[in-house]
Amino acid sequence: MITSTILVLLIPFVCTSLGAACVLFMKNELSVKTTKMLSGFAAGVMIAASVWSLLIPALEQSQSLGKMQFVPAVTGFMLGMFFLLILDTITPHMHLDNSVEGPKSNFSRQTMMVLAVTLHNIPEGMAVGVLYASWISGTTTITRAAALSLAIGIAIQNFPEGAIVSMPLHSTGSSKLRAFVYGVLSGIVEPIAGILTILAIGIIEPVMPYLLSFAAGAMIYVVIEELVPEMSEGGHSNRATIAFMVGFCLMMTLDVMLG
């Protein structure tokens, strides 16, 4: 069980690495339209995962509270948002539009871009870890298939995310190999966050609904803070909106079919 769980936790990281490898084979950087579509797709997957795989199970696990079953979901959701907000505030990082956030530092542009993506990958790793911890505990209705569907959904959106990281790094002066390595490193935090969450199962089991919604709040914060501005940058485009819908439907389908 442990080996198979670790392997599943590595799937999103592997897909991030494969996406980052695009910089080794593609001659031209991603166009603005392509980047917007990929951001829209990733946003759709993350919103659907937050709702279907995290918030709904959090509400279901709180049914014993009756009409107050929303309390764990709302509390965890807001805590997840504040968690990412604090990380965004204390960590120097740079978004793809070259806007800098956080305290002043001597970090290079490349390092700050990687830090931005790394920060936003933490809730994705936590989300997969929380679902697997919930399944391993055996005290909830969450199945192994449900946890696997989330891991697959995150992995699918990680492929374009890896390319979105490595390609701009190369265009700003990094060598292809260096850009690839940075892209890979941006995703390594996901399996680490997932494994740490599972290892803490004895502590987190009593507060599982809070943690499920915590991961959802953190992921939706990433969507609003990072992906929505990227998919909306420049002129209006229906392509990014369509890509969002496709990503949402794909993740919803995975959750229903496998969960």
Task: Label each residue range with its predicted role.
Residues 1-259:
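Intrinsically disordered, metal-sensing/regulatory segments
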